[in-house]
Each structure stands twice: as C-alpha cells, then as structure tokens.
C-alpha cells in the first residue's frame, strides 16, 4: 500500500502557490441588443474607440462606427447569421489592418487580404493599417514622370503622370474598365506594380478581367482585390482602402504603383447603405454628409514621394459610373473636384464605333502635361486643337450644303485624325508607335487615303518601321526627343510604305 506523506503534499502545494502569478486581464465587453442587415447594436463596450475591431462570441468581426450615449453601432464583416441577441462582444483594442508582402503579387484577394483564388495561404511578415494618413506636402514632389496607358488619345492629349489621380468617368458599358485594364497591360516591363480593386461587380466580370491579365502575363506584377456584388456592404466599403494599403507598401519601398478603383460609385452606395442602417442623417441623394471625406481620404493617398522618401509613386485611376451622362450628380462632382483631371467616356461615341470612346473636348489632365516626354509634346501639340476645330466644323457642316475647299480639307483631315485615335481592346501601343501614328496624321500623309484604309495602313506602317527603320525607335527611346534625324527616317518610311500600300490596294 502506498503511504501518503503529508509533508510532501504540502511542499508541492506550497511550490504551486509560489509559482502562481496573479495576472488580471481586463477585457472591455458588451452585450448584443439587436442584430440584422449587417448592423449590430451593442450595450456596454464603454472604452471602445471609433473604428476599433470588435469580436462576437461566435467569431464574427465587426467595426465600431457609431459611438452613441447608450449603445455602440457596429458594422459586421460577415453575414453574422449566428449572432444572437444577448450574446457577448469583446473589444480587441486593434484598428483594421492587413498583412502586406511581395507574395501578394499575382494573387486575387478579398478586402481582408485573404486569398480567394484557391492557391493557398499568402506568407506575410509585415502588416499595415487599412486607413493610414496620406503623405504631407513636404513628403511629396511634383509629378514629372509619364505613366503610359498605351492609348493614343490619352497619352497624347490627356497625359497621366506617376503620382497623379485621373478619374475615368462615363455611363455603364462605355469601356471604362477596358481603359483601366489596357493601362495595366501596358505596364509590362515598366517596373510598375498594379493593384486592381473591384467593388460590387459581378463575379463573372472580375473573372474576365483576371483571365485577360493572366493570358497576357500581366498578373505577375498585379494584385486583384475583389469584393463582388453579393459581399456585405462593410467589405465593399473597405476594399479600396485595402488596395491602397497594399499599393502604399510598395510605394514606400521606392517602387512605382498604379491602383484602379472600379468603381467608387458602388463604394459610395455601400457606405450609404451602412450609414442609413446606422441611422446617420441622410444628405443629398440620401448619401451621408461625410461621403466626400470617404473618397478624399482614399484618393489623397496617391502621391509622388520626395527624394528623401525614395521617389516611389502611387498613381490612382478611380472609376465613376454616371447615369445617362449626368456629370453633375453628387458622387461624380465630388470625385472630379478631388482628382487631378478626368477622362470622360461618351456612350454616343461608343455607339458610333469610336473606341476608346473618349470625349477629348471635356476630358482634361491638370498635371500630366508636365510628365509628357518631349517627343510627344512636339508631335501632339496641335492634335487637340485640330480635333476641337473639327468637332465644331462637323456640327456646322450638317446644316451647310456647299462648303469651300479649305473647309472640306479640314473635315477630311479631322475624320482621319479621329480614325487614328481608334484602337482595339487589349492592344496598347508603345510611345514610339504613338508618335509615329500622330505624326503621320497631323502632317497630312493620310489625307490621300480612304477613311476605311487608314487603320490598315497605320498597322502596316508600324510593322514596316519596326523591321526596316529600327533606328527610329532607338532615337526616341534614348533621347526622348523627336529629332530631325528621327523625322527624316519617319518621312522616308511613310513614303516607302505608302507606295507599297497603294500598289497592294490596286492589285
């Protein structure tokens, strides 16, 4: 029989008592009063901060947005179907943040930076706050490097610089996303990291964009953040900030980034839904009073950093959808006033077969011209003016029957210039090709061709110059100027190609 020794037992108990460390962990808790429509009202949580993450008993996370005298309004980051009235909630003491790393490149993630492409976890050692203050005045420098979109109409007349914010605005189905994805495709080999944020879109549309990027090898330098139409409003509202945090991570590491928000109208609608459910007072078009701040704090994060901070940049291309061309609605006017210019896409031009359907007359870039390369300035200087005069003449010519020869010539030139601005989707052009195309049009080399022959001739001319006059591209890319030598080479190439082309057409 085992003898029980009392002194041994008392020694063990004494040791355990001495080892006992009385740690008091204070947790700020509350109780669910009501829950529904993605909103929970909570009693308690006295010490909670605005924007703090709270955790429900069954694991759902929420953000405390409304701090009222007797309860806290929390928006849920999930469906919250298992949350019950009376269950407990605890404050986490953290503000929303996401992991960030190089490993995110080529992946499709959601607003919480969790992968949704079925390719496993993403390793990350660092994290960033989803909402962080924008760089101040001293931290920035003015925009001076071009960000080429590969679209002639934009790069020649509405140029975008690295660190600029340029709005893409237009009705539904006018090619807004196409302009944005073409810009991503054109960054291949330019050492620019792209972030595409899809907010409240159809999952099929997002899949189509991802497929296009994968086929063209553009996913290598792209991150897609997607919250589709069936996602909770909270996540649709957060997605752009998640994208911005990822782009900022690269920007502060001396890299160039491009971020596309597709589109901010849907984010504003998600925010309106949250605000109304939280019983915040509605303002114009039932949007809450701080919807301007919603977008301004997001877009101000795009910047060109100073040399002390490593000259990284973040260029933002927000997209806004208008209803039947109404640019004076609330969200469009807000975003126009925040950004450094806008590209206006018109449904009428799109339906008339002019694609990309950019309305050059009312599209502007407020800072990009400082970023244009000299060669482009030299050839594209008079393009915008000629097109504006042509549009005016065309409207007048509809009513006048007999036009003098000069007017007829100007109309013919305008039609050909409009033709050279047309481009197929996913076929961006290099700067050298754009310069060649514009020079051919503005100097009258296309005037003798039929309108239907213009695009075919230009395609063949680009191929001809690439194979027979490689020096042309070398001069432009090395000197960034349209030198006399380059002009002589181009004139020669145009003449030779024109003779070949006309012989082919006759044959």
Curated annotation (Swiss-Prot):
Gene: atpA
Chief location category: plastid
Subcellular location: Plastid, Chloroplast thylakoid membrane
Site (Required for activity): 363
Function: Produces ATP from ADP in the presence of a proton gradient across the membrane. The alpha chain is a regulatory subunit.
EC assignment: 7.1.2.2
Class of this enzyme: translocase
Family label: Belongs to the ATPase alpha/beta chains family.
Name the UniProt record assigns to this protein: ATP synthase subunit alpha, chloroplastic
Substrates-to-products reaction catalysed: ATP + H2O + 4 H(+)(in) = ADP + phosphate + 5 H(+)(out)
Self-association state and partner proteins as the record states: F-type ATPases have 2 components, CF(1) - the catalytic core - and CF(0) - the membrane proton channel. CF(1) has five subunits: alpha(3), beta(3), gamma(1), delta(1), epsilon(1). CF(0) has four main subunits: a, b, b' and c.
Species per Swiss-Prot/TrEMBL record: Eucalyptus globulus subsp. globulus (Tasmanian blue gum)
Annotated binding of ATP, by residue: 170-177
Topology in membrane: Peripheral membrane protein
Alphabetical list of HAMAP family matching this protein: ATP_synth_alpha_bact (MF_01346)
Entry GO terms, CC: chloroplast thylakoid membrane; proton-transporting ATP synthase complex
InterPro entries per the UniProt record, alphabetical: ATP_synth_asu-like_sf, ATP_synth_asu_C, ATP_synth_asu_C_sf, ATP_synth_F1_a_nt-bd_dom, ATP_synth_F1_asu, ATPase_a/bsu_AS, ATPase_F1/V1/A1_a/bsu_N, ATPase_F1/V1/A1_a/bsu_N_sf
């Amino acid at each position: 029989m085992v003898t029980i020794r009392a002194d041994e037992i008392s020694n063990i108990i004494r040791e355990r008592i001495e080892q006992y460390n009385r740690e008091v962990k204070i947790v700020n808790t509350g109780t669910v009063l009501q829950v529904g429509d993605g909103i929970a009202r909570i009693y308690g949580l006295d010490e909670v901060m605005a924007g703090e993450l709270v955790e429900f008993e069954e694991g759902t996370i929420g953000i405390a947005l409304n701090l009222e005298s007797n309860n806290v309004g929390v928006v849920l980051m999930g469906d919250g179907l298992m949350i019950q009235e009376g269950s407990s909630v605890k404050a986490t003491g953290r503000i929303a943040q996401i992991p960030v790393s190089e490993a995110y490149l080529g992946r499709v993630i959601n607003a919480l930076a969790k992968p949704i492409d079925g390719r496993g976890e993403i390793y990350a050692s660092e994290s960033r706050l989803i909402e962080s203050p924008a760089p101040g005045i001293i931290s920035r420098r003015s925009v001076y490097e071009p960000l080429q979109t590969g679209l002639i109409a934009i790069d020649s007349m509405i140029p975008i610089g690295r660190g600029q914010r340029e709005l893409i605005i237009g009705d539904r189905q006018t090619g807004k996303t196409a302009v944005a994805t073409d810009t991503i495709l054109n960054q291949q080999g330019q050492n620019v990291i792209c972030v595409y944020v899809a907010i409240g879109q159809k999952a099929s549309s997002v899949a189509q964009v991802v497929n296009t990027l994968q086929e063209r090898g553009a996913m290598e330098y792209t991150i897609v953040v997607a919250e589709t139409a069936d996602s909770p409003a909270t996540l649709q509202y957060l997605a752009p900030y998640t994208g911005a945090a990822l782009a900022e991570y690269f920007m502060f590491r001396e890299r160039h980034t491009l971020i596309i928000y597709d589109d901010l109208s849907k984010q504003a609608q998600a925010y309106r839904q949250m605000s109304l459910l939280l019983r915040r007072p509605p303002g114009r078009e039932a949007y809450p009073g701080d919807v301007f701040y919603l977008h301004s704090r997001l877009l101000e994060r795009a910047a060109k950093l100073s040399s002390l901070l490593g000259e990284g940049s973040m260029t933002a291309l927000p997209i806004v959808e208008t209803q039947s061309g109404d640019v004076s609605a609330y969200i469009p006017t807000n975003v126009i006033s925040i950004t450094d210019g806008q590209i206006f896409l018109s449904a009428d031009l799109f339906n008339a077969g002019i694609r990309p359907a950019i309305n050059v007359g009312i599209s502007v870039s407020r800072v990009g011209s400082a970023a244009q390369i000299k060669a482009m300035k030299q050839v594209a200087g008079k393009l915008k003016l000629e097109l504006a005069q042509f549009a005016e003449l065309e409207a007048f010519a509809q009513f006048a029957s007999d036009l003098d020869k000069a007017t007829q010539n100007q109309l013919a030139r305008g039609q050909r210039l409009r033709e050279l601005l047309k481009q197929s989707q996913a076929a961006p052009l290099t700067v050298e090709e754009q310069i060649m195309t514009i020079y051919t049009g503005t100097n009258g080399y296309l005037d003798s061709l039929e309108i239907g022959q213009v695009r075919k001739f230009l395609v063949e001319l680009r191929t001809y110059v690439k194979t027979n006059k490689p020096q042309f591209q070398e001069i432009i890319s090395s000197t960034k100027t349209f030198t006399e030598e380059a002009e002589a080479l181009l004139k020669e190439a145009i003449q030779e190609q024109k003779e070949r082309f006309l012989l082919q057409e006759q044959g």
